[in-house]
From Swiss-Prot:
The gene is APOA4. The keyword Glycoprotein does not apply. It comes from Bos taurus (Bovine). GO terms for molecular function: cholesterol transfer activity; phosphatidylcholine-sterol O-acyltransferase activator activity; phospholipid binding. This is Apolipoprotein A-IV. It is found in: Secreted.
Length: 380
């Protein structure tokens, strides 16, 4: 049902941002995914159920957060739910209106650019090639980094298994006491190395954001001479393009982080299986160690083969975004359903503004002298 999609959104939020505070992006993701899942099914018969589900999922974001509840968090939770519910209703009402506005905007743009259709198509084609040149090295770098990090992880973990096998052969009488420290150290190393792996791979997606901004700005400059009296409409379309491209970059970052977490979760049971076998006989333990060694290699290799191509896949998606823009601005565009990206961008802007306003109010609440006396909470 609708709830299922929202639960998946919350699961992604948990993987990509385990923070002590709820943030604007998390809330916007839940509202947008909920709106998208509803689609055209927002019938009056289930309106009250849908609202209660949305309220439930937003409240879930505030559960199990670290630290005590602050005045800001408490105020946020009280104000957020009615704000989000109203925003969701507005999304439903504004969708068709915005769809018509975007259709008219593209119609005006195409009419203005039609005399220069060949030049415009050429400029976008040039921009595609520039984008490929910009992003190509990053895709290669990601693949290289994935290979390197996977090899390092394998090299760092294998010695622990080998040491446990050696200890097992030498201490058959006291297996549990002898192997426990090694198993615990292996567990700690798995957690540490996977975090380091994420730390090295996820910045790749952040670098792509900068390249996207540069490329869209160059495209704006190259098309400006052909859209002098419709520049605002062209800018709006390019803002939508940049939003979609950056969204792909954020999704790439989330996928890398999620796959690293999957790797961790895949390795943990293997280490635990050794712990569980310690109370049995040496033969059981030997089998567990053999499986640990084999499965460790397999898990790391699966990660390498899955994540390695992410860069190339991302680059193809970026080229597709530019090709879609070329089609939209071309004389044979036909009907293009792209108003939803603008609707999502507007939603995220509104949620971000809501959070910023609330935080500004909170920051202005304490008396000014209290800022000088940092150890004293309430200006005492």
């Amino acid at each position: 049902m609708f709830l299922k999609a929202v639960v998946l959104s919350l699961a992604l939020v948990a993987v990509t941002g385990a923070e002590a505070e709820v943030n604007a992006d998390q809330v916007a993701t839940v509202i947008w995914d909920y709106f998208s899942q509803l689609g055209n099914n927002a019938k009056k018969a289930v309106e009250h159920i849908q609202k209660s589900e949305l309220t439930q999922q937003l409240n879930t974001l505030f559960q199990d957060k670290l630290g005590e509840v602050s005045t800001y968090t408490d105020d946020l939770q009280k104000k957020l739910v009615p704000f989000a519910t109203e925003l969701h209703e507005r999304l439903t009402k504004d969708s068709e209106k915005l769809k018509e506005e975007i259709r008219k905007e593209l119609e005006d743009l195409r009419a203005r650019l039609l005399p220069h259709a060949t030049e415009v198509s050429q400029k976008i084609g040039d921009n595609v090639r520039e984008l490929q040149q910009r992003l190509g090295p990053y895709a290669e770098e990601l693949r290289t980094q994935v290979d390197t990090q996977a090899q390092q992880l394998r090299r760092q973990l294998t010695p622990y298994v080998e040491r446990m096998e050696k200890v097992m052969r030498q201490n058959l009488d006291q297996l549990q006491a002898s192997l426990a420290p090694y198993a615990e150290e292996l567990q700690a190393t798995v957690n540490q190395r996977v975090e380091e792996l994420k730390g090295r791979l996820t910045p790749y997606a952040d670098q792509l954001q900068t390249k996207i901004e540069e490329n869209v700005e160059e495209l704006r400059r190259s098309l400006a001479p052909y859209a002098q009296d419709v520049q605002g409409k062209l800018n709006h379309q390019l803002e939508g393009l940049a939003f979609q491209m950056k969204k792909h970059a954020e999704e790439l970052k989330a996928k890398i982080s999620a796959k690293a977490e999957e790797l961790r979760q895949g390795l943990v049971p293997l280490v635990n299986s050794v712990h569980g076998s310690q109370l049995g006989n040496a033969e059981d333990l030997q089998k567990s160690l053999a499986e640990l060694s084999s499965r460790l290699d397999q898990q790391v290799e699966d990660f390498r083969r899955t994540v390695g191509p992410y860069g190339e896949t991302f680059n193809k998606a970026m080229v597709q975004q530019l090709d879609t823009l070329r089609q939209k601005l071309g004389p044979l565009a036909g009907d293009v359903e792209d108003h939803l990206s603008f609707l999502e961008k507007d939603l995220r802007d509104k949620v971000s503004s809501f959070f910023n306003t609330l935080k500004e109010k909170e920051s202005q609440a304490p008396a000014l002298p209290a800022q000088e006396e940092m150890p004293v909470p309430l200006g005492g």
